[in-house]
């Protein structure tokens, strides 16, 4: 199973509904929704109220990536707003097992996120409980950053850890994914690939989504 997740943070919010529909027609599997509070990361984005409006206009699962302080306080709000997947960072969560359990109890898939500068050993225990791991291939906070090449090796290491500890756990990657590297990250072990400007920066979003999904599937068959 290889899933493509357009990151709507990179879209044009004047016409985001139309752009989301274009990604759906192009074969997108999940919508990735970044949430930033200006404290954990140096940027501020939309919260659960905007997510609830997107939920009304999109049939795909919504993956809410919470880059915020005190995520446990807001997780119920995001689930209520329509998030189907919710991920939290290991870097600001001292009770990751409790947080993952909370997400699951609310009926959503529970994910743990690891930043580029954090050792993968930090999430080893969380792998036993997580439905997915989100590996950041840029430093979180802004769309359109350059892919960190070391992420390919980290993907391979993470896949080995996942296969040993919890084979059903999905591996997601986010940051700097374009046409030139999407096949490589899939071959290295990514099950879910988040793409922002690599989709929404195209003139024809539907065609670009379809092209990237084809590249992912071709990488699996090689």
Curated annotation (Swiss-Prot):
Native organism taxonomy: Bacteria, Pseudomonadati, Aquificota, Aquificia, Aquificales
Annotated residues for binding of substrate: 7, 65, 141-144, 174-176, 196-197
Recorded catalytic activity of this chain's protein: D-ribulose 5-phosphate = D-xylulose 5-phosphate
Listed HAMAP family: RPE
Biological role: Catalyzes the reversible epimerization of D-ribulose 5-phosphate to D-xylulose 5-phosphate.
Keyword Metal-binding: yes
UniProt pathway: Carbohydrate degradation
Catalytic residues (UniProt): 34, 174
Group of enzyme by EC: isomerase
Cofactor(s), names only, from the UniProt record: a divalent metal cation
GO CC terms in record: cytosol
Annotated binding of a divalent metal cation, by residue: 32, 34, 65, 174
Co-factor binding comment: Binds 1 divalent metal cation per subunit.
One biological process term in Gene Ontology: pentose-phosphate shunt, non-oxidative branch
Origin superkingdom: Bacteria
Gene3D superfamilies: Aldolase class I (3.20.20.70)
NCBIfam families membership: PRK05581.1-4, rpe
Protein name in the entry: Ribulose-phosphate 3-epimerase
Assigned keywords, A-Z: Carbohydrate metabolism, Isomerase, Metal-binding
GO molecular function, one term: metal ion binding
